[in-house]
Amino acid sequence: MSATIEIQNDIALIRMDDGKANAINFEMVAALNETLDKAEAGAKAIVLAGREGRFSGGFDLKAFASLGPEGVYKLLDAGAELLLRLYGGPLPVVAACTGHAIAMGVFILNACDTRVGASGDYKIGANEAVTGMNLPIFAMELSRDRLSPQHLTRAMIQGFIYDPAGAVEAGYLDMLSEPDKVEATALAVAGQLAQLPGKAYAWNKKSIRKGTLDRIKASLGAHHKL
């Protein structure tokens, strides 16, 4: 499985691990949606983690090369719908950024409520400007919401890649932990968030983010128009 789930003490720990870059393809999206179904049914908060040294390298470029334009648009929409689920879903979501997070990997971070990152020699950022790709609407909207305004141009238009400390300053991460403690730290944060009244958390989260959520929803199926 490319994503697994364990639920203990009302906290769902979801791990992405495809043995490689944790690339986002249809298989990974389906696996994550399945784990989120289980989390929403049986937990009060979620921790989303990668594997050691790697959170996610972004969309699966091999899949992009083989899918053709329409298939690529469908994968982009599937990724956008996953981000909508994380960003607008009812449960607190804490990211345990265990290593490199690139492109779609950082947009997943942006969709999580609190982001705990591993300190160390890791790369975090959106490289679309460097690789010559247009940013999807969901990437722009989430970045406007979560990144520091002072870093938005550098991060999203110029494709700057940050180290973990710089990622905190830019707004990709909220805090750092030692690499061997990042998952435990994220679980502790999730445990604290799970104590908050769940209905109010869900309502406030969705209401405050409604504008961003609506703009992303409106972009589904329209990537070819960018």
Regions found by a protein language model. Name each.
Residues 116-122, 168, 173-220:
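C-terminal long alpha-helix characteristic of the crotonase
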Residues 84, 106-107, 140, 153, ...:
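Alpha-helical segments flanking ligand/cofactor-binding loops in enzyme cores
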Residues 139-150:
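Hydrophobic, secondary-structure "cap" segments at the distal end of domains
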Residues 83-131:
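Glycine-rich beta-to-alpha active-site loop
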Residues 114, 154, 158-160, 166, ...:
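Well-ordered beta-strand positions
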